[in-house]
Amino acid sequence: MQIRELRVPHAYEVTPVQHADSRGVFLEWFKADAFEAATGRAFDLRQSNISVSKRGVVRGIHFADVPLGQAKYVTAVAGSVTDYIIDLRVGSPTFGSWDSVELDDDSRKCVFIGEGLGHLFVATSESATVSYLTTDVFRPGREHGVHPLDTDIGLPLTADALLSDKDAAAPTLTQALASGLLPQWDDCLDLYTAVSTQGA
């Protein structure tokens, strides 16, 4: 298992080792000890989700209040998506920047998205099934969004992207910042310290 940090701090790309034979393929797509050794933090699983999307569907940009926050560990179990991680943490040195990873049922790559980061993916196959592990249960009142087509963020999405009504009505980054909706960098750092395995 190879794990590398992305351009947005506290986000990681995970490439599992696949074992193929005449029967098919076996892989470990999440392994706590390898994850903790590479990232220096724990992943306390609280919920697992699956979404199925047709080509062109965009889900995001989503994030949760910090504290409590909700980290995610995401993979495409069927089909393919382009997965985006956006830094929404006010005060972060990389605030407003983003990185992306191609997730598909060939490479079987995964992405870890730390608390306070925004998350979006676009389905690039006819159908894409995505599995998420999360560190907190879904809490509707603490879940928020930023508009996926916000030009200030500049994700390479097309204007005809298929959005939910909620995502289409989400504020821009500037509006979310002005309203105090976004996570604070210092609050996120406190949370990262709390889940750190360093020195434990």
Predicted regions and their residues:
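Extended, polar beta-sheet/loop recognition surfaces of beta-rich domains
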Residues: 132
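Non-catalytic, conserved peripheral segments adjacent to functional cores
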Residues: 1-106, 127, 137-200
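Conserved metal-binding segment of the jelly-roll/cupin
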Residues: 103-126
